[in-house]
């Protein structure tokens, strides 16, 4: 077991040292399909089309059947991409089964917009409906009526602006509203809104206008973004890229949750990332990428990380996202984010600042079991729950929450793991362990023994599934569809396994009468 712990630390060190390449994000059905639609040449992208067809589920849709709300955008996009690729093997059949799938699916936007709707749904889905109606007339597709007024209001707002500033959040969905390349300009990485789909759409329009230098920058960006998926297939893209602030911030924050932030084996890799974050954090905060708009979520996590590293960051960068008692992720946000306020609370507590409003909001957003499950950036309740427990317990050594603890223990599956879908996942099991790690500290001996038994079962499940340098495959993060920020998830998996191993050693030591 000690050898495994060393291997874990070695892999973590390698992952941290690789974080200067813009980030690693798994492949996206939505962005790949959109890029294929805008590429024009079907025969030049046969491998990408084959990959797209291979991702279709048995029921005809794309995306996980466990989380139906996030299947519409990838299914619409794939359907529209494949209906123009009829000669390719499997394309016609895929279109037929996708059409039947969309006809059968209940419309989640028939009457209202769910709190955890995918990014850009109000712009993207009505656009797809219109395109499908003109291409596949006579088919009774869902119409998503609750999104129409939101799209119209957004288009009116956009119509009043000649060009959005680089990095504006709405550029991330440019493919759904951009009608001229003059309404956007590639950022310093060559992207439109850190979105391969938006960039591919913009590039297709710019080519017809002869904007050669900027088209070259967009091409270079798309090549780099495709490489970030590690799929090895030209024309397969991630849902978002780069993530050169989000990836290092969340990775170091995760190390803290596992008690690994200050581990000597990781010290140099952590120091390099902290120095970069410190240099990048300005008065306006940070966004998920260097050339994207600042938001409260990335800013709050960056403040946490910098404070944990012994820096003294100014809280002002976070305060200007505060509206009344809440923190908005970014100005004009459709609905407040629970995890953004959890991270703001954690940052304020670490920095010793008043946080009554954020604390009250986090407490008020529990479900009846005392957990947090109404999150808009991650589909699993285990993600906000782990972070909320850490934030609420910060600076309060005697903090206890028996209701949340009981619910967390009860949610462990028979196989020893945790998961919000039909099966356990390594990532979600790690989040459960991070929460239990905090809760264990204030428990009496009986409670600690009970937690230790649960952790032992989790460790057994993790050991049976651990592979060195494995690539996480399960998309649980909410973008335009569910996606997987590969390194962020891998750091969580490894940190969770390391924590469970250390827990097991401590329990053995305590059983032998030694000090923990």
UniProtKB/Swiss-Prot annotation:
UniProt-recorded Gene Ontology molecular function terms: terpene synthase activity
BP terms from Gene Ontology: terpenoid biosynthetic process
InterPro entries: Terpene_synthase-like (IPR050148), Terpenoid_cyclase/PrenylTrfase (IPR008930)
Ranges: PFTB repeats: 45-86, 401-443
Coiled coil: none
Keywords in alphabetical order: Repeat
Name under which the protein is recorded: Uncharacterized protein blr2149
Organism: Bradyrhizobium diazoefficiens (strain JCM 10833 / BCRC 13528 / IAM 13628 / NBRC 14792 / USDA 110)
């Amino acid at each position: 077991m000690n050898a495994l712990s060393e291997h874990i630390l070695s892999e973590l060190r390698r992952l941290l040292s690789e974080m200067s390449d813009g980030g690693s994000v798994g492949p996206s059905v939505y962005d790949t399909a959109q890029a294929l639609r805008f590429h024009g040449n079907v025969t030049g992208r046969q491998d990408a089309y084959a990959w797209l067809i291979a991702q279709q589920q048995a029921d005809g849709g794309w995306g996980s059947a466990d989380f139906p709300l996030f299947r519409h955008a990838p299914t619409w996009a794939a359907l529209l991409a494949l209906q123009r690729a009829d000669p390719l093997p499997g394309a016609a059949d895929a279109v037929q089964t996708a059409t039947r799938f969309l006809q059968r699916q209940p419309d989640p936007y028939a009457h209202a917009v769910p709190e955890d709707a995918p990014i850009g749904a109000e712009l993207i889905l009505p656009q797809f409906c219109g395109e499908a109606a003109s291409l596949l007339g006579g088919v009774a597709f869902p119409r998503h009526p609750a999104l129409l007024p939101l799209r119209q209001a957004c288009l009116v707002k956009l119509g009043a602006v000649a060009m959005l500033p680089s990095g504006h959040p709405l550029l991330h969905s440019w493919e759904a509203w951009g009608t001229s390349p003059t309404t956007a300009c590639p950022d310093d990485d060559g992207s439109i809104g850190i979105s391969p789909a938006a960039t591919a759409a913009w590039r297709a329009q710019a080519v017809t206008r002869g904007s050669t230098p900027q088209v070259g920058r967009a091409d270079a960006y798309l090549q780099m973004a495709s490489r970030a998926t590690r799929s090895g297939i030209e024309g397969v893209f991630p849902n978002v890229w780069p993530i050169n602030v989000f990836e290092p911030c969340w990775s170091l924050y995760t190390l803290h949750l596992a008690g690994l932030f200050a581990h000597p084996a990781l010290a140099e890799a952590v120091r390099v990332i902290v120095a970069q974050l410190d240099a990048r954090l300005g008065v306006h905060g940070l966004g998920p990428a260097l050339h994207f708009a600042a938001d409260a979520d990335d800013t709050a996590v960056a403040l946490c990380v910098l404070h944990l590293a012994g820096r003294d960051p100014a809280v002002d960068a976070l305060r200007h996202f505060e509206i009344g008692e809440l923190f908005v992720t970014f100005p004009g946000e459709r609905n407040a984010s629970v995890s953004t306020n959890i991270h703001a609370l954690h940052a304020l507590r670490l920095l010793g600042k008043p946080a009554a409003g954020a604390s009250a909001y986090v407490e008020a957003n529990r479900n009846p079991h005392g957990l947090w499950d109404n999150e808009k950036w991650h589909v699993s309740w285990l993600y906000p729950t782990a972070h909320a427990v850490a934030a609420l317990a910060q600076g309060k050594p005697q903090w206890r929450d028996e209701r949340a603890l009981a619910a967390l223990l009860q949610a462990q599956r028979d196989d020893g793991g945790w998961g919000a879908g039909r099966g356990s996942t390594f990532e979600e099991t790690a989040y459960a362990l991070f929460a239990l790690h905090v809760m264990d500290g204030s428990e009496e001996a009986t409670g600690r023994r009970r937690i230790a038994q649960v952790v032992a079962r989790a460790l057994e499940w993790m050991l049976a599934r651990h592979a060195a340098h494995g690539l996480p495959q399960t998309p649980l993060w909410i973008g335009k569809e569910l996606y997987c920020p590969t390194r962020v998830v891998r750091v969580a998996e490894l940190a969770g396994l390391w924590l469970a191993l250390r827990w097991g050693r401590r329990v053995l030591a305590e059983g032998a009468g030694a000090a923990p």
